[in-house]
C-alpha cells in the first residue's frame, strides 16, 4: 500500500472508527477544503469546521464503523469505497432518534500535500440513510 493509501486508511480508522478528534488536527492542512461535505452541499473549510460537522454527526450516530472495500492511489490522491454502519442515537436533520442500526455506502477521495489532507470529496448514499430512518418513503419503480 502506498503512503497516501495508508493515510486515507488511517483517517477513516482513527477519525471515524476510533473517534479520535486529535487525528483531525494531525492530518489536516489548516486550509483543507472538504467539497460539498457540509449541510446542503456547502464546503467544509479547515479542521475546526470539520470538527463541528464531525461532532454533530457523532452526536446523532453512535457505534460508527467503516469497512473499506477498495483502495486506489494515484499521484497525490487516494480513493476508497466504503460502507458505514451506525446506530441512530440522537437527533439528525430534524429526525428524532430511532435506535435503528443503519448502513450506507460511499466513496471518498483525499488529496495530500506534504503528508496532510488538503482537499477531500465524499459521496455517500444519503437517500438510503433517510429511507432507513423512515424519513422518506422507499422509492418505487413505476
What are these regions (language model features)?
Residues 1-142:
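C-terminal and inter-domain tail/linker signature
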Amino acid at each position: 500500500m502506498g503512503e497516501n493509501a495508508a493515510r486515507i486508511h488511517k483517517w477513516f480508522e482513527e477519525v471515524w472508527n476510533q473517534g479520535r478528534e486529535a487525528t483531525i488536527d494531525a492530518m489536516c492542512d489548516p486550509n483543507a477544503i472538504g467539497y460539498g461535505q457540509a449541510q446542503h452541499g456547502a464546503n467544509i473549510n479547515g479542521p475546526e469546521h470539520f470538527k463541528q460537522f464531525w461532532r454533530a454527526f457523532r452526536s446523532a450516530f453512535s457505534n460508527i464503523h467503516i469497512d473499506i472495500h477498495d483502495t486506489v492511489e494515484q499521484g497525490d490522491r487516494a480513493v476508497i469505497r466504503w460502507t458505514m454502519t451506525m446506530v441512530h442515537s440522537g437527533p439528525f436533520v430534524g429526525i428524532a432518534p430511532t435506535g435503528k442500526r443503519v448502513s450506507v455506502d460511499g466513496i471518498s477521495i483525499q488529496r495530500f500535500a506534504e503528508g496532510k489532507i488538503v482537499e477531500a470529496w465524499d459521496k455517500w448514499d444519503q437517500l438510503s440513510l433517510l429511507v432507513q430512518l423512515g424519513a422518506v418513503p422507499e422509492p418505487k419503480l413505476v
